[in-house]
Amino acid sequence: MRAIDVKTGMKIPWDVRYSLSLFIFLSSILFLSNGQDYGMPGEDGGGGAEPPPEMAHCNGIFMSYNFGSREREYPHVKNVTAQSWAFKSTAMIVNAGREELKGWQMFIGFRHKELIVSATGATPMDGDYPLDASNGTTFVGSPNMDLKTSIETAGDFTQISANIEITGTLFGVSKAVTPMPRTIKLTNDGWECPAAKRKGGSMHVCCKRNPKIKNKIGLKTKFAPRRYGDLNIVYDVLQSFDSNYLAQVTIDNDNPLGRLDRWNLTFEWMRGEFINTMRGAYTHKKDPSECLYSKAGQYYKDLDFSQVMNCQRKPAISDLPPEKKEDNMTGKLPFCCKNGTLLPPIMDPSKSRSMFQLQVFKLPPDLNRTALYPPQHWKIDGVLNPQYKCGPPVRVDPSQFPDPSGLLAVTYAISSWQVVCNITKPKAQASRCCVSFSAFYNNSAVPCNTCACGCNDIDTDTCNANSNPLLLPPDALLVPFDNRTLKAKAWAKQNHMPVPKKLPCPDNCGVSINWHVSTDYKNGWTARLTVFNWRDFAFEDWFVAIDMGKAGPGYENVYSFNGTRVPPSNRTVIFQGLPGMNYLVGQVNGTNPLRDPPVPGKQQSVISFTKKNIKGLNIPEGDGFPTKLFFNGEECALPKHFPKKSSGHRRGISVSMSFVFATIAAFALMMD
């Protein structure tokens, strides 16, 4: 065998050297081929980690969650439950089935007091960043909202999958524990997911279409089907040019008890857009300097920014007053110019919709007619109305409009997005109105809860924000809280009730409602509803809605208001002022301001109920009081207790028997 000299002085046989060279060559080829793995592309289309092997066995929607890393945050504390950690994790959703998934929604069940600071590739439905995800949160696609199938895209992962890179803060987990979510699942209608499987810092699940739930028969849609919540906003692009487009925003109130007064709408431009002109609404701030010193000012050098409506990233928008409705420049638009009033459709369908238009200018690289992106992070609020929580804009099929020519033709929007907002239940001490209870069988009134509408604006060092309110004589409900102290102390002394050294704080509500049980007899009962306005402005077209629970079907009549049952249960009744009495005036000074307390605006009526066909109704034990009460759509804080019926108080009797007793007594007096 022939040998070859090597510089090191070692002799290697030729066939061994040849084999070694071939091995190195093949290894390099294998290395290069492995570099082009079947990865998950990110936003830039680049490859990512290799998909887990479990995905190969999934015929449906595959989802995974991988915990990445964490780092201890300041301040460093010894208490493990109070220590915060910065963490990074990734989630993935892949359409591994044969059916396109429109408007995907992935729920991640966080459970370690997570605060989500940012996420790429998706948008949380539950609010804006930083987002409290202690009880989990749902992500939706942004910009990739729909997941096509591998079959129709030739396995293009940019169209069948989405990656979510999550950054946030978590609490209360020691170093030895990997903080994983409780679960991950798909929340789209018609899909079901088994329990997620976990291994170390990873978990995955394969969700499949529920065969028992048949797809609703209807028109096929190119984009996600429209959903309907309490408040529905549609963002329609009507005209599109290279550098700008005309959009129309339509707000529909679809909740029978929902309402907005003087609504304020905000959203966030994500790509440097700005509002050039508006019709049907206006922005609260118009500052040309914000435009001049922004990217818009650098690009649009010849544009007169003194005439531009708004260049804020988060503009605040409000409806125009009625006098602007026929204005040629800012009005002349259906459903506009109502001073921000959105009534329930059950009250007035013509006042349950608002509309405005805006001309939006774009910046590079979006300078073409098809580069259309809606603003994100929508929020809407009113003066004394329910709190709404809005989801992200979801692409839907273009809206249809009647042709302006009057012909039997239909005009379509270029693109449409829908934002669904739902009413949230007020948190404790965060309502905007409150309720007090009183009854004919008890001398004391149960006032509104302490700090029912919050105590952020008062000095809680001088009062107790957590104690129960003091019982009051009923006439004390007619005066402001500041004028009740002497009455409350005197009443407590008279009725031998304790008075704490530190008195309870006020309720701090602009509107309060008193519910007084007036009578209770064999076949029915009555109550008196009184609405107090402690604000300095009036409420137009006000309404009160009550849910009477078990007693609701017994509603008979209201004598000074209009009363309407709310279907389908008919346990809720909505009351509104009669014509000419639809204004709840504001608070005014007393006859002598130096001596007399302010006088609230007031509306009052008696309401009658029957006990027919309602078994086991006990008025004093709670059946005679509302289980929920709403003022202008806002759920008001209810007292924690009912007025108690003393054991010595006689039981209620029927009206007919009362009349008989009165007649006998009168006859006896005449005989004397």
UniProtKB/Swiss-Prot annotation:
PTM remark: The GPI-anchor attachment at Ser-646 requires APTG1.
Deletion consequences: Gametophytic male sterility due to reduced pollen tube growth and compromised directional ovular guidance cues sensing in the female transmitting tract, thus leading to an abnormal pollen tubes guidance growth toward micropyles. Normal pollen development, hydration and germination. Disrupted apical pectin cap and cellulose microfibrils deposition in pollen tubes resulting in an abnormal cell wall organization.
Membrane-topology descriptor: Lipid-anchor; GPI-anchor
Signal peptide start and end residues: 1-35
Glycosylation site residues: N79, N135, N264, N328, N339, N368, N422, N442, N483, N562, N570, N589
Gene Ontology biological process terms, A to Z: cell wall organization; cellulose microfibril organization; pollen tube growth; pollen tube guidance
Keywords linked to the UniProt accession: Cell membrane, Cytoplasm, Glycoprotein, GPI-anchor, Lipoprotein, Membrane, Signal
A GO CC term attached to the entry: apical plasma membrane
Source species: Arabidopsis thaliana
Prosegment location in residue numbers: 647-672
CBM2 domain span: 502-607
Family as reported in the entry's similarity comment: Belongs to the COBRA family.
One Pfam family named in its UniProt record: COBRA
Motif Required for processing by the PIG complex, a critical step for apical plasma membrane localization in pollen tubes per record, residues: 664-672
Localization in the cell: Cell membrane; Cytoplasm; Vesicle
Function according to Swiss-Prot or TrEMBL: Involved in the deposition of apical pectin cap and cellulose microfibrils in pollen tubes. Not essential for pollen development, hydration or germination, but required for pollen tubes growth in the female transmitting tract of pistil and toward micropyles, via the perception of ovule guidance cues.
Predominant location: membrane
Protein name: COBRA-like protein 10
